[in-house]
Amino acid sequence: MKISKVREENRGAKLTVNAKTAVVSENRSQEGILYNDPSRYGKSRKNDEDRDRYIESRLKSSGKLYRIFNEDKNKRETDELQWFLSEIVKKINRRNGLVLSDMLSVDDRAFEKAFEKYAELSYTNRRNKVSGSPAFETCGVDAATAERLKGIISETNFINRIKNNIDNKVSEDIIDRIIAKYLKKSLCRERVKRGLKKLLMNAFDLPYSDPDIDVQRDFIDYVLEDFYHVRAKSQVSRSIKNMNMPVQPEGDGKFAITVSKGGTESGNKRSAEKEAFKKFLSDYASLDERVRDDMLRRMRRLVVLYFYGSDDSKLSDVNEKFDVWEDHAARRVDNREFIKLPLENKLANGKTDKDAERIRKNTVKELYRNQNIGCYRQAVKAVEEDNNGRYFDDKMLNMFFIHRIEYGVEKIYANLKQVTEFKARTGYLSEKIWKDLINYISIKYIAMGKAVYNYAMDELNASDKKEIELGKISEEYLSGISSFDYELIKAEEMLQRETAVYVAFAARHLSSQTVELDSENSDFLLLKPKGTMDKNDKNKLASNNILNFLKDKETLRDTILQYFGGHSLWTDFPFDKYLAGGKDDVDFLTDLKDVIYSMRNDSFHYATENHNNGKWNKELISAMFEHETERMTVVMKDKFYSNNLPMFYKNDDLKKLLIDLYKDNVERASQVPSFNKVFVRKNFPALVRDKDNLGIELDLKADADKGENELKFYNALYYMFKEIYYNAFLNDKNVRERFITKATKVADNYDRNKERNLKDRIKSAGSDEKKKLREQLQNYIAENDFGQRIKNIVQVNPDYTLAQICQLIMTEYNQQNNGCMQKKSAARKDINKDSYQHYKMLLLVNLRKAFLEFIKENYAFVLKPYKHDLCDKADFVPDFAKYVKPYAGLISRVAGSSELQKWYIVSRFLSPAQANHMLGFLHSYKQYVWDIYRRASETGTEINHSIAEDKIAGVDITDVDAVIDLSVKLCGTISSEISDYFKDDEVYAEYISSYLDFEYDGGNYKDSLNRFCNSDAVNDQKVALYYDGEHPKLNRNIILSKLYGERRFLEKITDRVSRSDIVEYYKLKKETSQYQTKGIFDSEDEQKNIKKFQEMKNIVEFRDLMDYSEIADELQGQLINWIYLRERDLMNFQLGYHYACLNNDSNKQATYVTLDYQGKKNRKINGAILYQICAMYINGLPLYYVDKDSSEWTVSDGKESTGAKIGEFYRYAKSFENTSDCYASGLEIFENISEHDNITELRNYIEHFRYYSSFDRSFLGIYSEVFDRFFTYDLKYRKNVPTILYNILLQHFVNVRFEFVSGKKMIGIDKKDRKIAKEKECARITIREKNGVYSEQFTYKLKNGTVYVDARDKRYLQSIIRLLFYPEKVNMDEMIEVKEKKKPSDNNTGKGYSKRDRQQDRKEYDKYKEKKKKEGNFLSGMGGNINWDEINAQLKN
């Protein structure tokens, strides 16, 4: 039972209660609590009594729908055998009901209490291994009642009830199939199944002997326990109360892995085992490699003992110092069988008998279980009898690992989806369990390190203190850490990783246009200023001086200003003023680089010395920001003009609207439905024409270009409405009340009689009318449910804005439907429909109603458009800028804040899509943090974490939002001057030739392009698109692909636009212009032509080019996210490991514990190793080490890369290490040590964007290596690699079927000659060769039906395949699946099989049934007897 997703009934509609769990501090101890979401009930928190009563109520309500058998409603069953099985199940469940129908029909409360007491006693007896069923006399009833109760649950009563309802004779095979296929999962225990089988065999008078089974004890009693949720009732409450965070402070002020409450004093053996494991974690953290090796060998012997028995050679010689990793590798290929698999069941046609396969799978699970029990028992016995020191001296620790192994095997067979020979091998199981154990230990150290970093390092950057102490828990956390504190850590880490990705792309975009890097200096941000000279030769530039890498110093400023709209927009900006005193454009580039570098150095948890320093030209950056805000006001106005609004409305009306919308800078709230969700673009024309809405009509009867101008009008109106929605509607004070009135209209006047009347009418209505009435009833109930929820939110939170109301509704909706890591495809959404869809739908409907009313009341001029000539651009509101100053306050704050300048510069070097995603993520972060503080406050929990609800790195998050929002509006806006982006027309024409086949003849590119564009395309229509007569036309997508894409990559994966593409575009444009503004089209051909026209438009305008570039960026961005995730986990692992080492009894040198630095700035660091580890990973934090030349202690400046700092850490470690490598201590359980250099190489390859410079491996190859190497310490992350890859592509409507194949990987690198040391097999991600790629389908409504159209055509899918495989060659002949069949409809029951299909099959089957009845050989419950010869023939075949 998922407490976090509890639902309660509300007049037929389901309503989210959102009862959640949390960990809070109670009187210097931690306790799990259950609380209701405060957004619904205000301050609400449950005590022990409330919690138990609440859980009991939830469990009891679920019992009303209890069924022993699940009914497979979605299965297409057309053969007699399958219909028979399902009919048997329905009869048992619905007509017979076994015990439950009798129990639920008893009105006497005493009966109910007695049944419940009986179930509790039965569970207690079973736990205490007491044989026999409990006596009803002990359940608080008299003797007569006890006898009656015995009769109800007697085996005889069961048998009689079955015979009375199902009087057919069935075979043993049929019973096996029913149990295997339909039995409720919680009842799938071997003895329960055997008890049920015995009962059914007796009921059908079939011979069956199983003397070991007592039907009442092994089936009936267990059903009662399951029905009353006895086990869950006792365990759910206890698990909530005992819930805790991974790490908590102990009494001595140190962190420790948490264990269950009770401890060894209570005699709790499991707690004693966990205490032994805590001791193991402490002891394993040793700098002595011999100690760690010995402990790993002992653990390894336990695994070998469990799977191979005590006679294995590795257990014979206790003194053998074997290598555990070599043993692990050797046993992985062991083909010995852990269990003997039963033979697969095949039908005569060669296909698998699915029902028989279910039985086989259950048999396999039981074989696994029995073998696991046997292994467990012999392992326990061997450990108890061992006197030779093979295993750990602590018996409780041995038992802990044995229990972990047992649980690991159980988990494998419990989740078995398919029976495979591979998973039945001892080699697979034993080494899977070994890796699980290693992962488990690694994750514990990571959890410890995370707690240390966040709660015990307050003085990490106290640079003004001469003595600091690290590893000491902050006083405010001594009483415990709440779950809300941990949630804030999660929010902070996500923000840091996402920001790191955007910083990497900003650096990449700036450097790709300005410098040419080499392999030794591949990090642009680490290049030194132009004045940096060589240390050994002061007359020579340093090797990493930025001057050595410039592409073209003369055009440097113009190159940079490409990202700011083009240099033509900056002609009046006084660069000379800000670059005076010997500064030039190289200093300008260095300033931008330093801003981005400082952003990369930011840690939002600790302020380093490089944090907020602003060592760049702050005046220049702030002046640029101010200049762009002035430009922004012009951009706002120009967008009105470019969207043709002055063609349909008066300039005076538009001027008033412009001032009203943009006089203030408006923040967009997160989780509020976007405008294009509220108003779907394709339906927009019909909606605004509707007289019940706005009734807008544009008179174009005399217009020769009616179709084209009508399309312009609706596009203009759509843009205007979008701007009003975000800048006026959502922030209007009266809109909240308007929305509430609309949303609660039905709830305020809800009539139960109307509901009953509709239900009565449905019963007597015909099929067509019944469908309409049922839809009317569902809408009525849903509107009431939604209205009641809105009323409740307003009642509990009277001060909430419309945006906050929307946030809560969408948060609840998303919480119910975001449980799956893998994104749902359109087909899966039809099969597995989202819960609470009416919440989202009615939110959109009521927002739409309120918005249309808002338009009528505030902007009535919109209702009366008229067509007139478009004025000159210069005459459209020429004085607009003097009326609005939306950024006045923000300008001054940016001028005084280094932090805001960082956000400004980083966001300005992002592509439009990336800047938009960055803003969206910031909104999500802000909403998440706000929600954490809200829940913590309402549950009475004080949050001690340093993350402020309304700030990031000390600045107001609203200002950060406004800065990024400005960049979003400006990113992607380009000038109309070719010279802003290319040297001249010829260079531009040459560049566009990579993507356009303009039949270049080998001479001048510009002339060839001109001739091509002046040639005929179709009829009298010229090609024209790319030339205006005198000069080439500047294409926005070409410019964006130049700035943010990679030409060499894009030209290889795309097909060039051809003359035939342009001809098809013009033909479709002419044809579709006649019906493009209809909204809902008349025919399937019209809709498909519109879709095809949009595809061709995207091709000829190079929009697809930006699509491919964005997909590549998303794939690269995810890889960068992973390297920072892994680096964070590595830091936390090392912190946790060395924190344990600091606090155990192992030998440690003085400088490991305390570092007393005597230099320019004397400093003493207690907990030195913790500081040094943090300094390795936190940019800007200096690291102390012994200089290799002077052998004196020195301190770095903290600005080196992590790789350089690791070298410094090694020199620090030489001051105390004796027998081992301090950096690598314990690392053997985090990663494969032999692959460390390969992992480092992969990390640098990703971070430095080497894919785009070398193209020596494919994206699939990189993702495969990340899957294989990166996350060996956490299998959860590893499994998510292909899932996230799938999700990225699905966001672009591309479905890919990935599969794993065997590949090769390199182990180790000879750093001198770069030769590969060793080759080894590995898993590789690829795409299924046949039907591996297919498009999502869009659903379009027609006037008389529905049509499904592929979202992506074959050409697009081919480019995606090339994108994933480039530079590898791939055969795409059969890889793309063209879906001829329709997408599953809305009434789908699963796997593309609709209710209509099922009804048709049922009609056909009814005819078949009537025929069988006449022959006297069908189900007697349906009017005949079964022809068992026919059934058995089906079974045999």
Curated annotation (Swiss-Prot):
Record protein name field: CRISPR-associated endoribonuclease Cas13a
Known role: CRISPR (clustered regularly interspaced short palindromic repeat), is an adaptive immune system that provides protection against mobile genetic elements (viruses, transposable elements and conjugative plasmids). CRISPR clusters contain sequences complementary to antecedent mobile elements and target invading nucleic acids. Unlike many single-component effectors, this CRISPR-Cas system targets RNA. CRISPR clusters are transcribed from pre-CRISPR RNA (crRNA) and processed into crRNA by this protein. Cleaves linear target ssRNA in a pre-crRNA-dependent fashion, preferentially around A residues.
Activity regulation note: Target RNA acts as an activator for non-specific ssRNA degradation.
Required cofactor(s): a divalent metal cation
Gene that this polypeptide is encoded by: cas13a
One MF annotation (Gene Ontology) recorded for this entry: RNA binding
GO biological process: defense response to virus
Keywords, sorted A to Z: Antiviral defense, Endonuclease, Hydrolase, Nuclease, Repeat, RNA-binding
Natural source organism: Lachnospiraceae bacterium (strain NK4A179)
Domain of life: Bacteria
